[in-house]
Amino acid sequence: AIFLVGDIFDFWFEYRRVVPKGFVRTLGKLAELTDRGVRVVFFTGNHDMWVGDYLARECGLEIHTSPEVMTLSGKKVFIAHGDNMKIDGQPMLKFLNRIFRSRTLRWLFSWGVHPDWALRFGHWWSGRSRKGHGEEAARGASLTEPYTGSSEPHTEPLVEYAREYSRTHAVDLFVFGHMHFPRDCREGRLHVVN
C-alpha cells in the first residue's frame, strides 16, 4: 500500500464537474497503480481538504478525512495529516479550521465562486502558508531533531499530540505529513515520523 498524508496538491477544490488542472500525470500514475491492485490511501491535508468523490471514483484512491489507527505489519500505526492536531490554545487556527471544514462554506464556495477565481485564491492562500513555514522548514533540516522555534527539544505540536495520545492508547508509530519536511523523533516507545 501507498499512504499519502495530505497536501499532495497545492490546492484542491472539486466542483461538481470541474477539478483543478495541472495534476494529470500524478492522477494518471495514481490511477495506474490502483488499476494494478496497489492500495493507495489518501489522508487529506489542509491544502486538499475539499476533496470530493472524484479521486476515489476516477483514480481508485481510498480517502480519509480524519485520523485513523491501522494495523500494518503487526504494528499499530496512527496516521493523519496533522493540520488540526493540538490547536486548542490557538483560537485563530481553531476558527480557520472550523470555517474551512464547514459544509455550508464549501457549498457556498462551489456555487458562488468561479473555478478560475477559486483556484487563484487557493494558490494565493497556499503560498502564504508555505512562506510562513518556509524558514522554519529550512532551519529544521535535521531528521532527528525537530525545529521547535525555541531551545526546548521535541516540543513540536505533533510530537506533543503523539505523547498525549500514547498515554491512553497503545500505538507503535505516528505518521504525519503536515510539516512538509522529514522528521524521525523517538522517545522511548514513542516514535513519530513526518
Name what the model sees in each region:
Residues 1-72:
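Core catalytic region of metal-dependent phosphoesterases/phosphodiesterases
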Residues 29-30, 60, 75, 95-97, ...:
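Short, charged/polar low-complexity linear motifs in solvent-exposed/disordered segments
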Residues 58-66, 76-78, 83, 87-95, ...:
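Conserved beta-sheet core of the metallophosphoesterase superfamily
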Residues 80-157:
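Active-site-proximal loop/helix segment associated with metal-binding centers of metalloenzymes
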